[in-house]
Amino acid sequence: MKKMALIYNPVSGHALFKEKLDTLIELFQRHDIILSSYRTRGNGQDQLSQFLCEIAPAGILAAGGDGTVHAVVNALQDAKIDIPLGILGSGTSNDFATHLGIGGDWESYVERIAADESRRVDLGVLEGQGRYFVNVLSAGVLTGIAHEVKSVYKNSLGRIAYYLKGIGELPRLHSFPVHITADGEH
């Protein structure tokens, strides 16, 4: 049997993923894949890296929103682990999963994972900070919006909660210089 790590955020989105957990486990077991679960705890990335090193999974499934994906990507890089990462978007926006066309039918998604289907995506790094990203690198006034919006508003308003918070920050906008290097070119 193949072993995969399931890293899930119990409060992302409407905190509904927990209700679907047994269904997900059963789908993977049909394909002889055992899931070892890890429940995220805010800033517990060091513990997440340790967990991944200890169980040595063949792959990882991140269930949560874009913040969960970000935490898992950074834990993988911190621990120098190079294994496939699957995403089950269960957050408020799930921008990255949506961009990749991941979502909806879990059964066919699990079948693709069991068949070792994957694709490569670019991994960015913020030099000097040692932080990695796969979806968005942002800077400036609007960067904290995702973290500043209270869960109660995200759960009741969804994406609109982010937009409303962003509108409130517009008077504070200002420009600043940025230097970008991509594929070795400035």
Model-derived regions: residue spans:
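Catalytic core of DAGKc-family lipid kinases
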Residues: 5, 38-40, 78-186
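ATP/NTP phosphate-donor binding region
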Residues: 1-63, 70, 75, 107-111
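Helix N-cap/beta->alpha junction signal
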Residues: 64-65, 138
